[in-house]
Amino acid sequence: PSDMVDLIKSIKSASALTDHTVQIVTDGPNPILLNQLTQIFVMSEDWAKANGCEVSYNWDAGETSYCASNANGTGPFKITFREQDVRTVFEKNNDWWGDDSTFNVDTIELLPIANDATRVAALLSGEIDYTNVVPVQDIERIKSSAGHGVKMTPQNRTIFFGMDQGSAELNSSNIKGKNPFADKRVRLAMYHALDMEAIKDKVMRGQSVPAGIITAPGVNGHTAARDERLPYDPELSKKLLAEAGYPDGFEVTLDCPNDRYINDEAICVAAIGMFAKIGVDVTLDAKTKSQHFSEVKEGDANGMTSDMYMLGWGVPTFDSHYVYSYLFDSAGSWNKVNFSNARVDELVAAMGVETDQDKRNAMIAEAWDITQDDVTYLPLHHQVVNQASKSNVDVPIRMNNEPLFRFANVN
């Protein structure tokens, strides 16, 4: 199924009542329908049918369709040229229905530059005007460059590790016949082994916010109290491992992307060193994001699933139900830790239909109580968004790191 299915599965039908009124019928109450609809974009029915775009395709398997590479819409810019992974050109749409007084840009050229050093050099040399992918190690250099500036804001994305707690045995471990991660004491030991302040200072150059919960500030259900990390305490970790029956630790492989999150592989390397201090021998398997996510979600070519992995999660609906439906529900499409709790499943279903906000918030709080106590995931940090540009270029920074060029101005 499409990755969008969880956002629209409550919708039974949609019809146009007038030129400017759409009626949506759901299969029951949906308290976050409006939040979900912010992620759904309207396509022309005639265009979609004419180009065979009615059936979803499997992006993870490399499938594509006409509508994945051809524009259809009524936005402020038109695509006039596209060479995938090389160059895309947008021109102002003079027939746009919206207010064009918010921007003065006529042409945008998108140039994907994968290499960090090359991208920064292109900015400082004047080859490009703006980038929303800024290496943390280059922030001060860009700031000190005449004619350039850097903007920062907390991002709606939390980075964490997942541990398979549901399988009878880990694929990569030297422990056979049982699963160390099935024991909460082991998961807790892994948590206490992580010094996120050290990772913030040494790996992230201060550009991260250590997290105690796997959802970002601003999301319904997040609280400052829940975001307080448990203390870094490797001695307690060793004690917990011994109590769980692993005084000498164990071996496991950590799957990590090397081109998706800010300093993702470096974070994994640092964490592996910390796990080693408590006797857990972790082997790094770092790979490109396309391969990483495919193998975490579907298994590798041999059908082997990941024992431990890095994942980042943003919440476009700004509501915890989005987190729970994907990551904690027993049937969640990204619940690759194989967590299953009947009460949490009940709460996920209930918070999806409860319209009394106080009752719903209580359900969300109970779900977080259960899963934080379970140590289902190891929260690492909330990312920080950095964007850099020439001083005369103003692109408002957004916490989802998706720039809206209809608010961009060049002075």
Residue locations for each model-derived region?
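Ligand-site clamp/hinge motif
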Residues: 65, 95-141, 281
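Periplasmic binding protein-like
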Residues: 128-129, 145-150, 254, 267, ...
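Long beta-strand-rich cores associated with HINT superfamily self-processing modules
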Residues: 387-411
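Periplasmic-binding protein-like
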Residues: 36, 175-219, 263-267, 371-379
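Extracytoplasmic/peripheral linker and loop segments enriched in polar/acidic and small residues
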Residues: 184-188, 192, 200, 278-297, ...
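Surface-exposed binding/hinge segments that line
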Residues: 3-56
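Gly/Pro-rich hinge or "lid" segments in bacterial periplasmic/extracellular proteins
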Residues: 39-103, 107-109, 235, 239
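Structural transition elements
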Residues: 77, 192, 209-243, 260-265
